[in-house]
């Protein structure tokens, strides 16, 4: 079983039904729901998703959707050590650095799923777009 960190853009593709990316995001979440992969995210990602959804939807609706999401994926911790690693890293995007080091420090995560693959060039983990990950998973 693969253990994956699902980045903000993939979750937003799902919630905003952004074409053509939404279909791949849906397939990723179906794999999680069917226990074919173990999906994770971070508190920062959940906060960002809430903030962006709040621009177009009501608070109660967003809360319910996030609760549903958290029934199929888990949240990993971010602590001071992870923040310091991110601050001292060569990542150009601080938020991506936080996600990366949270995933790297969580012992079972092997893969980051993001459409911003180029932003994770410094990662020690495998990094795939949802489309490429799904092609590799189902050749």
Which ranges hold each PLM region?
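A generic, residue-level signal for flexible/boundary positions that often mark functional hotspots
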Residues: 9, 15, 69-72, 111-114, ...
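Short, flexible helix/strand-to-coil boundary loops that buttress conserved ligand/catalytic motifs
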Residues: 15, 87-90, 124
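Alpha-helix/helix-capping structural signal
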Residues: 9-10, 44, 81, 118
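Acidic, PIN/NYN-like endoribonuclease modules and their adjacent C-terminal/linker elements
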Residues: 3, 104-139
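PIN-domain endoribonuclease scaffold, especially VapC-family toxins
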Residues: 4, 26-93, 97, 101-106
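Short, well-structured N-terminal submotif of metal-dependent ribonuclease cores
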Residues: 1-40, 54-61, 122, 132-139
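Acidic active-site catalytic centers that drive phospho-/nucleotidyl reactions
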Residues: 7-9, 96, 116
